[in-house]
Curated annotation (Swiss-Prot):
InterPro entries: BioC (IPR011814), Malonyl-ACP_OMT (IPR050602), Methyltransf_11 (IPR013216), SAM-dependent_MTases_sf (IPR029063)
Pfam families: Methyltransf_11
Described purpose of this protein according to its UniProt entry: Converts the free carboxyl group of a malonyl-thioester to its methyl ester by transfer of a methyl group from S-adenosyl-L-methionine (SAM). It allows to synthesize pimeloyl-ACP via the fatty acid synthetic pathway.
GO BP annotations listed: biotin biosynthetic process; methylation
Family: Belongs to the methyltransferase superfamily.
GO molecular function, one term: S-adenosylmethionine-dependent methyltransferase activity
EC class (word): transferase
Name of the protein in its database record: Malonyl-[acyl-carrier protein] O-methyltransferase
EC numbers, comma separated: 2.1.1.197
Keyword Transferase applies: yes
Length: 292
C-alpha cells in the first residue's frame, strides 16, 4: 500500500518569462566529456521530492505541456514510453492524444512511481516500470515513441541516446526536453564569488546532445534551444523550489554550507534583483527525432 498524500502549503509560484529560441539540426559530432553523478543518489533525491513535485515543478510542467503538443497523430507501433516520468503528470494528456497506445511510465525512483499511482495516473494502459534510462529492460525495436521531459540531464547523452534508438522501432519518434549547460547560471555565478565548491551540476551542452543524436543514428534530429527565466521573491524560495523538485542534488558536493557562506552568496544574488524579482535562467533543449 502506498502512503497517503498529506496536504502541503504551496510555495509562491514564480513568474516565468520566455526569452529566445535557437534551432539546430544534427551534424557531425563534437567530443565534449561530461561527468555523471551516482544514479542511486539521484534516485534518492527525487524520491524524497515525490510528494512535493507536482506542486513545485512549475517550469518542468510548462515544458512538458509544450512537449505534449508535439506528439504525433499516429505511431508505427502502439507502444510508448514516458522516460523519467516522475509522478506521470502528463499521463492523461498523453492518453488523450494517443488513445490506442499502451504506455509505460519509466522512472529510476520507485517513490515517484508510487506517487503516480497514489494520484490515480497509472492503469492498465499506463503501467509503471522502475528502470534505468541507460539500460532499459525492453526489447529492441519495441517502442513507437519515447517521450521524456526534464529527466535525462543525469544521463550520459551518448549512452542514453543509443539506448533510446535501440528500443525504438523503425519510424518510431523521440520527443525530448532537457535542461542544458548554462541553466541556473545566476545561482552558479553567485556561489563562485563565495567559494569554488560545486553548488550547481555541470549539465550536458547542446553540442553533447547533438553529437549523441548523430552517433546514435538520428541523422535528421531537430534541436531547438529555448531560454526561460523564472523570477522569485528570495534566494531561499529558489533553494526550496529546487529541493521540492529533487533538483538540489549536486555531483561532487560534500558537507553542509556554512551560514556565513550562505549569507555571502545571498548578497551576491540579491545584486541581480530586478523589478520582477530574482532571476533564475534555464536553457532548455527540445529535441525531435525519428528512427530510420
Amino acid at each position: 500500500m502506498y502512503p497517503s498524500c498529506r496536504p502541503r502549503t504551496p510555495l509562491p509560484r514564480p513568474c516565468m518569462t520566455f526569452i529566445a529560441t535557437i534551432s539546430w539540426s544534427a551534424e557531425a559530432p563534437v567530443d565534449t566529456p561530461v561527468e555523471r553523478s551516482g544514479k542511486a543518489v539521484v534516485s534518492q533525491h527525487f524520491g524524497r521530492a515525490a510528494r512535493s513535485y507536482d506542486e513545485h515543478a512549475v517550469l518542468q510542467l510548462a515544458v512538458g505541456r509544450s512537449l505534449v503538443q508535439r506528439l504525433p497523430e499516429a505511431l508505427p507501433i502502439n507502444h510508448a514510453l514516458d522516460l523519467g516520468c516522475a509522478t506521470a503528470p502528463f499521463a492523461r494528456a498523453q492518453q488523450q492524444a494517443l488513445p490506442d497506445v499502451q504506455w509505460q511510465a519509466v522512472d529510476l525512483s520507485s517513490a515517484m512511481l508510487a506517487e503516480a499511482a497514489e494520484r490515480g495516473r497509472l492503469d492498465e494502459t499506463y503501467q509503471p516500470l522502475c528502470a534505468d534510462a541507460e539500460n532499459l529492460p525492453l526489447s529492441t525495436n519495441s517502442q513507437g515513441l519515447v517521450f521524456s521531459c526534464f529527466a535525462l540531464q543525469w544521463c550520459d547523452p551518448q549512452v542514453v541516446m543509443a539506448e533510446i534508438n535501440r528500443v525504438l522501432a523503425p519510424g518510431g519518434r523521440l520527443l525530448l526536453a532537457v535542461p542544458l549547460a548554462g541553466s541556473l547560471a545566476e545561482l552558479q555565478s553567485s556561489w563562485q564569488r563565495v567559494n569554488h565548491r560545486p553548488h550547481v551540476n555541470a549539465l550536458p551542452s547542446l553540442a553533447d546532445w547533438r553529437s549523441a543524436a548523430f552517433q546514435a543514428g538520428f541523422a535528421d534530429a531537430q534541436l531547438q534551444q529555448q531560454v526561460m527565466v523564472e523570477y522569485y521573491d528570495s534566494v531561499k524560495a529558489i533553494a526550496r523550489r529546487l529541493k521540492a523538485t529533487g533538483a538540489d542534488h549536486v555531483s561532487g558536493a560534500s558537507g553542509l554550507t556554512g551560514k556565513n557562506a550562505w549569507q555571502a552568496m545571498v548578497k551576491e544574488y540579491e545584486a541581480r534583483r530586478t523589478q520582477q524579482g530574482l532571476p533564475l535562467t534555464w536553457n532548455v533543449l527540445f529535441l525531435e527525432a525519428e528512427k530510420s
